[in-house]
C-alpha cells in the first residue's frame, strides 16, 4: 500500500482512481498528475515502481494543495468571512445555508433536527 500525502492509497486500483482518495484531488487533477509523471492510465498502484511513487509524491507536494493544508485554508477562508462580518460569514455563524437556498421549509441538513415549539398547534 503506497502512502502519498499522508494517505494510504489502495494498491489494487488504477492510479487515477487511487489518487482520488487524497482530499483535494479529483478526477481531473488525478489525470493531470499521471500525465505529468508519464504513467499510463491503465497502470495499477501495485505495478508502480518506487521511483514513480516518489515522482507522484513530489508532483503533489510541489503543485497541489491537499489534505490538511487544503482543509486549513478552507477553514481560514470561512473564518475570514465571519471576522469581516460579510453576509456569507453571518450565514456561516448562524449555521444557515450560505448560497441563497430557501430556509422556510428546507435546509434541514444545515439547520439540524426540527425543534418543537410549545403551543404551536393548529
Curated annotation (Swiss-Prot):
Keyword Glycosyltransferase applies: no
Biological process annotations from GO: translation
A GO MF label: rRNA binding
Signal sequence extent: none
PROSITE patterns per record: RIBOSOMAL_S13_2 (PS50159)
UniProt xrefs under InterPro entries: Rbsml_uS13_C, Ribosomal_uS13, Ribosomal_uS13-like_H2TH, Ribosomal_uS13_bac-type
Keyword Ribonucleoprotein found: yes
Family per record: Belongs to the universal ribosomal protein uS13 family.
Protein name (record): Small ribosomal subunit protein uS13
Amino acid at each position: 500500500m503506497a502512502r502519498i500525502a499522508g494517505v494510504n492509497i489502495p494498491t489494487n486500483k488504477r492510479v487515477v482512481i487511487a489518487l482520488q482518495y487524497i482530499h483535494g484531488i479529483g478526477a481531473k487533477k488525478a489525470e493531470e498528475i499521471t500525465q505529468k509523471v508519464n504513467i499510463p492510465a491503465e497502470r495499477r498502484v501495485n505495478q508502480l515502481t518506487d521511483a514513480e511513487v516518489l515522482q507522484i509524491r513530489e508532483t503533489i507536494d510541489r503543485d497541489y494543495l491537499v489534505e490538511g493544508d487544503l482543509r486549513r485554508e478552507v477553514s481560514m477562508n470561512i473564518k475570514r468571512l465571519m471576522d469581516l462580518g460579510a453576509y456569507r460569514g453571518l450565514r456561516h455563524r448562524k449555521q444557515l445555508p450560505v448560497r441563497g437556498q430557501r430556509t422556510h421549509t428546507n435546509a434541514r441538513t444545515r439547520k439540524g433536527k426540527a425543534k418543537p415549539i410549545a403551543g404551536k398547534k393548529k
